[in-house]
Amino acid sequence: VEEYYEFLINKFEKYKKIKIHNFGLLDKTFETKISKLGAGSSIFTRSEGVAEQKIFIKAATEFIKEEKLTEIDLLYMNIEGSEYQLLANLIESNEIMKIKHLQVQFHNYVDNSKIKRKEIRKQLNKTHKCIFNFPFIWERWDRRK
């Protein structure tokens, strides 16, 4: 969302090591619309009378390769239902191994969210250790040594 992007550019302008990108990450590259609901903005939820904006989504695996990322210290993920697609893709591509610390909020309004979360947690447990788990609130995972 354009105004969130501008806000972050201004907030982090002093920090030269921080790069802000005006796109989201998922399992594939495409354009879509997002509902503008502040912290609850989502490509999954639509409400009558709520403003929407066209946004660009880039495949996370493509972004990791383009940026030549070999290690990601922290992936903080509160992406309003898109976490299932993104994590499944990172696990399947083995890019998950580049992530040292993962903090994720799973959302339960997505179809089959309990089943999807259970499967992702099972896969994550092979590469990462769960540090804390408050189901559908917050979870923290650290890469196994």
List each language-model region with its residue ranges.
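Phosphate/nucleotide-binding beta-alpha loop and adjacent structural elements of enzyme active sites
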Residues: 1-145
